[in-house]
Amino acid sequence: MIDDMAVPLTFTDAAANKVKSLISEEENTNLKLRVYITGGGCSGFQYGFTFDEKVNDGDLTIEKSGVQLVIDPMSLQYLIGGTVDYTEGLEGSRFTVNNPNATSTCGCGSSFSI
């Protein structure tokens, strides 16, 4: 785990608070939010979010408000400088990634290209 001074990715209060709420609903304090990148989507890469109980060797863990965000090393290289947030709007509620490395994104924001 690294401290706030050296974090290569921002985990917002809104995202951390939503993770805390969802973990509370599941009644499993071992859960962490994992963000990852996979090939696919209309722009070449897409973001994925899942809850995971384990942290693998090499994973980056960012802690905020008592909850953890976990990123694997392969995904982290595409996310450096980005922000993981949680938004509620007309399109619904969802975790989002604001990625300064993306040269283009699809309309829904779930896929990108570099």
From Swiss-Prot:
Pfam families according to UniProt: Fe-S_biosyn
GO process terms (BP): iron-sulfur cluster assembly
Residues bound to iron-sulfur cluster: C42, C106, C108
InterPro entries: FeS_biogenesis, FeS_cluster_insertion, FeS_cluster_insertion_CS, FeS_cluster_insertion_RrpA, HesB-like_dom_sf
Cofactor(s) the protein needs: iron-sulfur cluster
Main function: Required for insertion of 4Fe-4S clusters for at least IspG.
Family classification: Belongs to the HesB/IscA family.
Protein name per the record: Iron-sulfur cluster insertion protein ErpA
Organism for this UniProt entry: Haemophilus influenzae (strain PittGG)
Lineage: Bacteria, Pseudomonadati, Pseudomonadota, Gammaproteobacteria, Pasteurellales
